[in-house]
Structure formats: C-alpha cells, structure tokens
C-alpha cells in the first residue's frame, strides 16, 4: 500500500470521481454524453468510445488533484492507456489515487436486497490491480427494502470480500447502496449502520476499509462510522439525486465526501468544444468539492 496515497485518502480535501460504468451501464453513459448506439457496431468500439470520453475527463485541466482525491475505474479502463501510460499510472502521476471496480454486478433480488454475483477471478484481478499500481477497490450491493436478514447478508458478503482484498494489500471501498426511493429508507440505514459497525469491529487494527453509502435521511447518521479507527474515509454516492440535490444533502453531513459518477458527468457532451467541456467539468468539480469540504 502506498503510504502517501493513504495519507491523501485519509486527510485530503476533495472527493472521489466515479468513472466506473461497466458493460451494462456503458450505452446509457455514452447516450447521456451524446454518443448514440448507431455510432458503434460492437462492444470493442463501444468501450473505445467510453475510454475516449474518460480520457477527455481525466486529461482535462478541470480534473484537478487539488479537488479530486481519487478516481474509480472499470476493469477495461485499468488495462487501457491514457497518453501512453496505463490509466492508473496516469492518475497517480497526476496526484489522483486510482481505485478499481471489482464486482461482477448484482444478483437477483432476494430478502429485499441484491447481493453481488460471485467474483470468481478476484485473486487474479487483484494481482493485476497491484501490477497496475491500483490503490484500492470498489464493490456494490443494493438494498431495496427493510429486511434485517437481507441487510445482514449484504454486509457480511461485503466484509468477506473486503478481507480478501486487504490481504492483497489493497484498500476496499465497501458499497452497500440503499435505494433512495426505498419506503423505509431511514430505518434501513439504522439497521445497515449497526451491521457495518459489527463488520468493522471484526477487523484487526491494520485492516483498513472505506465505505461508500447513500446519503442518509438523518443527517450525520454515519459520522461515527467515519470516526471508526478501521475506516479511511466515508464517501457517498449520488444515487439518482440531481447534482444540486446531492450536494445540498451532502453539505449537511460532516466528514462525508462525494464519490459521484452521473452527477459529475451530467453536463458533459461529446459535441462540446474543449473550452466548453473544461468549463462544464470545472463547474461540476467545484460544486461537488464545495459540498464535500464546506459543511453547513
């Protein structure tokens, strides 16, 4: 583990850019960027176009390490190059800490939740991540209803994988998303917090994790998770809120910082001139940074 990057992730001012749309969500991400499905004829072309989009984001002067602490990449992105360097090295050289999405998507809903599908090649992926100088990982589950067994299963699965990731020298971001439209969202979050606390308490002193959570209904609910000795940082997802709404809610939560994907890229278009693109990205970065750093 890179100690300088750990220091930046623990104490740095800023947020994490989530650039990890995978195969399933890529057509939608490209469409929002203004690239329609008739502009590519196969998956290779699609992934090249999305890599071009991400390259445009990370090479922009608006993608500044003064405001962006880290970036989460999709596996394809990790294996591709930006300006002649592997993406992780390009980011690290720029001062942005690289993370890798390692989950294989969500299983069918059961007990009001979606667990992660099995990650059969996890060891191999983590070895490649280490070769590519990746600092940490991210994996997402989804909680849809207040079901204590389901929530417990989600958290147990996350920590089970987290321990394997830590053993390989990486810092896992544990992401048990709570659907923002869940009927009992506030109650779900209280159960989730208690389960996460149990998971954290099961770790040894040197086993560090990060948490990526839905912005809680009750402000500052997760503050004591952020203060837990095994937690490097708690970040939040935008989860379907508009950028303005997500930023507004984030400002009410001390110590939590953003890890936004759609809310970061929502105003970016393929047709923009470089100047327009840099300004749109810069405006998004500035507003998300402000919500992460300057609290109410």
UniProtKB/Swiss-Prot annotation:
The answer, when asked if Lyase is one of the entry's keywords, is yes
Q: Does the keyword Lyase apply?
A: yes
Q: In which pathway does it act?
A: Carbohydrate degradation; glycolysis; D-glyceraldehyde 3-phosphate and glycerone phosphate from D-glucose: step 4/4
| Active site, UniProt feature | 175 (proton acceptor), 212 (schiff-base intermediate with dihydroxyacetone-p)
So where does this one cross the membrane?
none
Q: What biological processes does GO assign it?
A: glycolytic process
Which keywords does this chain's UniProt record carry?
Glycolysis, Lyase, Schiff base
Q: What name goes with this protein? A: Fructose-bisphosphate aldolase class 1
User: What organism is listed for this UniProt entry?
Assistant: Staphylococcus epidermidis (strain ATCC 12228 / FDA PCI 1200)
């Amino acid at each position: 583990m890179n100690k300088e990057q750990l220091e930046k992730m623990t104490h740095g001012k800023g947020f994490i850019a989530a650039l990890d749309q995978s195969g399933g969500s890529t057509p939608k991400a490209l469409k929002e960027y203004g690239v329609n499905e008739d502009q590519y004829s196969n998956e290779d072309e699609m992934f090249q176009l999305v890599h071009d989009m991400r390259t445009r984001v990370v090479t922009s002067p608006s993608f500044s390490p003064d405001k962006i602490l880290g970036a989460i990449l999709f596996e394809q992105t990790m294996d591709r190059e930006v300006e002649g360097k592997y993406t992780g090295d390009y980011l690290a050289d720029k001062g942005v800490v690289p993370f890798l999405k390692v989950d294989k998507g969500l299983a069918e809903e059961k007990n009001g939740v979606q667990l992660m599908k099995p990650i059969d090649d996890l060891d191999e992926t983590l070895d490649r991540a280490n070769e590519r100088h990746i600092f940490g990982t991210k994996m997402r589950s989804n909680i849809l209803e207040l079901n204590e067994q389901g929530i417990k299963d989600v958290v147990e699965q996350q920590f089970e994988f987290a321990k394997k990731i830590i053993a390989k020298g990486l810092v896992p971001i544990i992401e048990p998303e709570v659907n923002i439209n869940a009927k009992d969202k506030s109650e779900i979050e209280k159960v989730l917090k208690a389960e996460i606390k149990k998971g954290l308490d099961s770790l040894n002193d040197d086993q560090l994790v990060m948490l990526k959570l839905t912005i809680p209904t009750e402000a500052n609910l997760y503050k004591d998770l952020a203060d837990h000795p095994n937690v490097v940082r708690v970040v939040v997802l935008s989860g379907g809120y508009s950028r303005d709404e997500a930023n507004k809610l984030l400002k009410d939560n001390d110590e939590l910082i953003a890890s936004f994907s759609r809310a970061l890229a929502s105003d970016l278009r393929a047709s923009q001139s470089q100047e327009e693109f840099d300004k749109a990205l810069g405006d998004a970065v500035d507003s998300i940074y402000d919500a992460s750093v300057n609290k109410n």
